[in-house]
Amino acid sequence: MAKVILFHGTPDKNVVPTYGKGEDKHDYGRGFYLTESLELAKEWAVCRPNKENGWVHKYELEIDSLKILDFQNENILSWLAELMKHRDASDSKRYRMLAGKFIAKYGIDTSEYDVIKGWRANASYFYIAREFVRDNVDIDILEDLLSLGGLGIQYCIKSELAYSKLKEIKDALYMVSYDEFNEKYNLRDAEARRKMRD
């Protein structure tokens, strides 16, 4: 039985992953987001500016029977198209039209997948997405630009089956210091933005 250990960083001490919950405008749409990196989960737990400590919940995901889409194994343009489905890089009519064509050409139908795995995005990625669909960024350098961020890999639990295979390891709940890890989160984010601009 193949399993993967994942972490969920959150301001909430009590978390119940529930099918159908979550924000539509996250990178891969509605779902429950986790990472294999404990350090990233700690940063994500305190990424809000409210100066409160956060929590990292540890989970075990049984993956044998799950259909997983890993964007690291796909064309980078397919990943970018997936982000465009859920997050608006611009509210201009021209961008929306171009983004629609881009999604139609490069997008992957993710509806049959139980889990989506891939890079995490921040605002810098959407700047690049906007410039790319406007033909201001060459495809030859797109992958290099997108790999500069270093914002980590995330898993998004999508299906009822995947939720049923996710089990929290309750005695591994970890409190995260806001003062220590919020600064790390902000530094990582600022460095990703700087690399995108340079």
Language model features with spans:
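Catalytic centers of nucleases
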Residues: 31
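ADP-ribose/NAD+-binding catalytic cleft of ART/PARP-like enzymes
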Residues: 1-28, 46, 57, 192, ...
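Conserved NAD+-utilizing ADP-ribose enzyme module
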Residues: 2, 26, 47-52, 62-198
